[in-house]
């Protein structure tokens, strides 16, 4: 449908690109004029542009001369004079879009000249990269252009002091990673003094490798968490039980969704093993959860593919980059289940103090732009969620890479044999080869096979990313064979060594199709940079995960009927189309999942914005007296309306309950009597009680200085808001975990989540008002009161891997007894534990 509409009305991004061609003509027309200027005159142009903006001009009014100035500065500082196509890319970024530029086309330079224009407003511009190495490298190389033109530059990275971060954010241009920006935002909304904040209002962000950050990591939440004490015995017991279960008989596993669930027989075994009547009883929720997570750890999570064990710890492997994500933990107890599975020490779970996804963080910027080599396949998502068009920028030189059709083998062994033979043949000629794998396991299989053939090679995967830049740099040299997991080394160009062009350039060999076409395109794009020669080809088998998930059984049966050998490939455009169709289906599923996550996240986003805005008002306010008085009035109104509703006659009102609450929470023991309340209308009751409460409040204030009282109120309010918000995050998270079950009752889970979430938020606000009122009236005003954090938090990145953003939940801790050696075994066999599953313990 979208394609048909485009044929009729045209692609808006391409229309804009044609308009931009005319603007580029104007920029190029100023080239000679800029060359005549001295360095000082060129620098003074920045002051001139800023003055025009202060007088009311817009960035669009000055974009042509500003780009011309930045272009000339790049030529003088770096000896890199931007091409015409790079100016087209810079304009796309200036307009808040995504510039899709092929590998080696100079995206970083494009971003630099576009950012110069945005930075002229003086509101702070963030250049976002995926890791600290790239942020530092770009600042050292390209940051000099900004400094040459009189702008300030800062680097924001992990481990800086508060003062260093404030200085970095105060600069005109700040280089940072996406993680650090998100964590700083969360930390800023947990500070106890406004002076402790580091970020300015979010103005403009330019995201490098935008698809990686806004698509691949969109569902991964950034979390500030605090540890919580929890017994870990149950993880071990669930792990011991799950080990004896049999597939299909006791549980089922769906490879498409990676979901595992117990069968009726499995449930019966669990009930016998743990000596309970009903596993699905409310009091066994925690046990059920532990069994399910342990089952997932054993069946759906694979060592050296989803995670590795290093130094006695389970370390997650990023499914998109193949890198180890140290410090990041699977949430919702899955990490603990993996620790139990691997026989490691089970660590404590944590409580969420603050959380945000990249989707919601980056949508808060006034203006957003991005660069990548592959975004067109996700154009719909960028437009619908972030309001950005993908503009495909032409290459400076035509692409000379040959993309060969896929080769499909019957078995995985046949495929790997063919891969190694092809590498051996190319290696004899001296032509460099880059082998792309989808996980650590595959890279090590290929590596072992090459070692047996005595072919020297480098392996670039999650286990040795420290040498990444060095390995990638040499990957284009004569005779180099490099095995890389997915897009390890992204952001670093592979340049051809001497004599390689004559051999045909770099050959990229993919050992498996990724579920996303974009990731495959990134791998292909490693060859043929800036018009270089090169080639690419994918080797597939009917046993590959993508093929298995989307019905390769018929094709495999056909190959067997034809009597095809394991090492005999099919090279057919029909098969390639089938693979692409499968990829489109997976991409569609993933987009739908991200869209659904965003719809649920939007509920929390709205609530978070309200809380953070009100918290900021508390921090900035010198006098909270009016706010406190309003909270007291609201509390009184609520108590009266609850116990004395107008729907009942006065004789049925519970005046005793009103008096008990008011005396216990807001006044002294005999502050108000039931007798005083009798015979009054609801409004009169509210007026009388409010008058008494406010009189007591003013009397308390008179006992201390006004300054002491105001600080006392601020401390109480910050502590209460932070504690209640922390609990609310947890409750909303628990609500979200089970909300999908409402669909069985013909209710829309999203609508139910919104409705119940709103009610819970309203209840939290009421609790804040009541608690603040109580503490202000009942607590003793202390001298030199110090503001303290409710809980000490640390930044963590839970993985989205099949968990979306399920954060660690706090549930009631129930006692789980140790299994004695002579007790019945938990597997339900009827034998003693010591003679069954505990025999080797």
Curated annotation (Swiss-Prot):
Note on cofactor: May bind 1 zinc ion per subunit.
Broad EC category: translocase
SUPFAM superfamilies with a match to the protein in the record: Helical scaffold and wing domains of SecA, P-loop containing nucleoside triphosphate hydrolases, Pre-protein crosslinking domain of SecA
Cofactor: Zn(2+)
Subcellular location: Cell membrane; Cytoplasm
Residues given in the record as Zn(2+) binding sites: 825, 827, 836-837
One Pfam short name: SecA_PP_bind
Residue numbers spanned by region Disordered: 788-822
EC numbers, comma separated: 7.4.2.8
Keywords tagged on the record: ATP-binding, Cell membrane, Cytoplasm, Membrane, Metal-binding, Nucleotide-binding, Protein transport, Translocase, Translocation, Transport, Zinc
Gene Ontology terms describing biological process: intracellular protein transmembrane transport; protein import; protein targeting; protein transport by the Sec complex
Catalysed conversion reaction: ATP + H2O + cellular proteinSide 1 = ADP + phosphate + cellular proteinSide 2
Keyword Cell membrane belongs to the record: yes
Residues annotated to bind ATP: 86, 104-108, 493
Molecular function in Gene Ontology: ATP binding; metal ion binding; protein-exporting ATPase activity
Residue ranges of the TM segments: none
Membrane topology: Peripheral membrane protein
PROSITE patterns per the UniProt record, alphabetical: SECA, SECA_MOTOR_DEAD
GO CC, alphabetical: cell envelope Sec protein transport complex; cytosol; plasma membrane
Main location: membrane
Self-association and partners: Monomer and homodimer. Part of the essential Sec protein translocation apparatus which comprises SecA, SecYEG and auxiliary proteins SecDF. Other proteins may also be involved.
HAMAP family listed in its UniProt record: SecA
Family designation: Belongs to the SecA family.
Task of the protein: Part of the Sec protein translocase complex. Interacts with the SecYEG preprotein conducting channel. Has a central role in coupling the hydrolysis of ATP to the transfer of proteins into and across the cell membrane, serving as an ATP-driven molecular motor driving the stepwise translocation of polypeptide chains across the membrane.
Entry protein name: Protein translocase subunit SecA
Taxonomic source organism: Shouchella clausii (strain KSM-K16) (Alkalihalobacillus clausii)
Lineage: Bacteria, Bacillati, Bacillota, Bacilli, Bacillales
């Amino acid at each position: 449908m979208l394609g048909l509409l485009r044929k009729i009305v045209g692609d808006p991004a391409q229309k804009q690109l044609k308009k931009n061609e005319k603007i580029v003509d104007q920029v190029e027309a100023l080239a000679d004029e800029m060359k005549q200027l001295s360095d000082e005159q060129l620098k003074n142009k920045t002051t001139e542009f800023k003055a025009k903006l202060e007088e009311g001009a817009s960035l669009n009014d000055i974009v042509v001369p500003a780009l011309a100035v930045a272009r000339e500065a790049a030529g003088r500082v770096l000896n890199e004079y931007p091409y015409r196509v790079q100016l087209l890319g810079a304009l796309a970024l200036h307009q808040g879009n995504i510039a899709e530029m092929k590998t080696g086309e100079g995206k970083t330079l494009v971003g630099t000249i576009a950012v110069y224009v945005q930075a002229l407003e003086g509101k702070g511009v963030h250049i976002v990269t995926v890791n600290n190495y790239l942020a530092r490298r770009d600042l050292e190389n390209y940051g000099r252009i900004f400094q040459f033109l009189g702008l300030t530059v800062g680097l924001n990275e992990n481990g800086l002091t508060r003062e260093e971060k404030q200085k970095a954010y105060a600069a005109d241009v700040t280089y940072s990673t996406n993680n650090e920006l998100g964590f700083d935002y969360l930390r800023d909304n947990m500070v106890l003094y406004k002076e402790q904040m580091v970020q300015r209002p979010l103005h403009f962000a330019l995201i490098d490798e935008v698809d990686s950050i806004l698509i691949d990591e969109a569902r991964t939440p950034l979390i500030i968490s605090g540890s919580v004490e929890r017994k870990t015995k149950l993880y071990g017991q669930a792990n011991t039980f799950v080990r004896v279960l049999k597939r299909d008989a006791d549980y089922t596993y769906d490879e498409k969704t990676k979901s595992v669930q117990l069968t009726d027989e499995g449930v019966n075994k669990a009930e016998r093993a743990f000596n309970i009547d009903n596993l699905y009883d409310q009091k066994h929720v925690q046990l059920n959860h532990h069994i399910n997570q342990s089952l997932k750890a054993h069946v759906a999570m694979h060592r050296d593919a989803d995670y590795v064990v290093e130094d006695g710890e389970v370390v997650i492997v990023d499914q998109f980059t193949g890198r180890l994500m140290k410090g990041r933990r699977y949430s919702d107890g899955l990490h603990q289940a993996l620790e139990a599975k691997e026989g490691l020490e089970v660590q404590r779970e944590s409580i969420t103090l603050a959380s945000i996804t990249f989707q919601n963080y980056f949508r808060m910027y006034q203006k957003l732009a991005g660069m990548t080599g592959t975004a067109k396949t996700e154009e719909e998502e960028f437009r619908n969620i972030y309001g950005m068009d993908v503009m495909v920028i032409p290459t400076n030189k035509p692409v000379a890479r040959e993309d060969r059709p896929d080769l499909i083998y019957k078995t995985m062994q046949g495929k790997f044999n063919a891969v190694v033979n092809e590498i051996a043949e190319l290696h004899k000629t001296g032509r460099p080869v880059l082998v792309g794998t989808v996980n650590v396991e595959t890279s090590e299989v290929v590596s072992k096979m090459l070692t047996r053939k005595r072919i020297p090679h480098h392996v670039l995967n999650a286990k040795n990313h420290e040498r990444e830049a060095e390995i990638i740099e040499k990957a284009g040299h004569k005779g180099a064979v490099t095995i890389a997991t997915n897009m390890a080394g992204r952001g670093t160009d592979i340049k051809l060594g001497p004599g390689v062009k004559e051999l045909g350039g770099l050959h990229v060999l993919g050992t498996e199709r990724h579920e996303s076409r974009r990731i495959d395109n990134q791998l292909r794009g490693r060859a043929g940079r800036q018009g270089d020669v090169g080639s690419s080809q994918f080797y597939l088998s009917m046993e590959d995960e993508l093929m298995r998930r989307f019905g390769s059984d018929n094709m495999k049966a056909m190959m067997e009927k034809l009597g095809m050998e394991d090492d005999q490939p099919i090279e057919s455009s029909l098969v390639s189309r089938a693979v692409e169709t499968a990829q489109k289906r997976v991409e569609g599923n993933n987009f739908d999942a991200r869209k659904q996550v965003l719809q649920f996240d939007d509920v929390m986003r709205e609530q978070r914005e309200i809380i953070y805005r009100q918290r900021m008002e508390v921090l900035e306010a010198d006098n909270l007296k009016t706010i406190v008085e309003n909270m007291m009035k609201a509390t009184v109104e609520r108590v009266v309306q609850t116990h004395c509703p107008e729907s009942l006659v006065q004789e049925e009102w519970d005046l005793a309950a009103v008096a008990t609450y008011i005396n216990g929470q807001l006044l002294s023991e005999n502050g108000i009597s039931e007798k005083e309340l009798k015979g009054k209308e609801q409004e009169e009751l509210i007026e009388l009680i409010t008058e008494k409460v406010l009189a007591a409040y003013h009397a308390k204030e008179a006992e201390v200085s006004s300054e002491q009282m105001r600080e006392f109120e601020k401390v109480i309010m910050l502590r209460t808001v932070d504690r209640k918000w922390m609990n609310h995050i947890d409750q909303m998270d628990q609500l979200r975990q089970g909300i999908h079950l409402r669909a069985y009752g013909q209710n829309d889970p999203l609508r139910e989540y919104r409705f119940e979430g709103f009610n819970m938020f309203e209840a939290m606000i009421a609790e804040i008002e009541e608690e603040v009122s109580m503490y202000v009236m009942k607590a003793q005003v202390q001298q030199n009161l110090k503001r303290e954090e409710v809980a000490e938090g640390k930044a963590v990145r839970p993985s989205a891997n099949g968990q979306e953003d399920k954060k660690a939940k706090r549930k009631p801790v129930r006692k789980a007894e140790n299994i004695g050696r002579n007790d019945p075994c938990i597997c339900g066999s009827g034998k003693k534990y010591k003679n069954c599953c505990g025999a080797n313990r």
